[in-house]
Amino acid sequence: MIADKDHKLFLNSISDTIDLFIAYTVKDSVARRIVKYVYNYEAQSTSTIPLHLSNKELAKELNVSEATIKSSLSRAKSSRLITVIGLGACRLISLNTKTICEIRDSLFSL
C-alpha cells in the first residue's frame, strides 16, 4: 500500500540515492525516467492506489512517443525496480522496494 507510513519513510530514506540505484540498474534513459516518475509519484502521493497510466498518458507526461514508452516500459520492468500489473489504461505501476533494498545492500557492501 503506497500511503503506508513505513513505505513513505523508506522512500524518504532513499531520496538522496534513488538516482544512483536507477542509473546502476536501468540503462535506457526513458526507462530511467519512468522509474523516477513512479518513485516521485509514490513519494508524494497520499493515495493507496498505485500509479495507473496508459501508454498514451505516460508518453504525454514524459514528452515521448507511445512507441518509445512501450519499449522503455519493458526495459524498466526487466530491471525489476517497478512492478506492472495489467495492461493499457487498467495498468498499475508500483515500485519494487525489495529489489531497491537488494541494490542498496549490494552497492553499499562494496
Put a short name on every predicted segment.
Residues I100-L110:
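Short, amphipathic alpha-helical interaction segments positioned at domain boundaries
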Residues A43-L95:
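Winged helix-turn-helix DNA-binding recognition segment
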Residues M1, L92, T99-E102:
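Generic short N-terminal amphipathic or hydrophobic helices
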Residues M1, L62-N63, L110:
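Short intrinsically disordered terminal tails
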Residues D16-L20, A59, T68, C101:
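A generic structural micro-environment signature
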Residues M1-T48, L53-K56:
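Short recognition helix of helix-turn-helix/winged-helix DNA-binding domains
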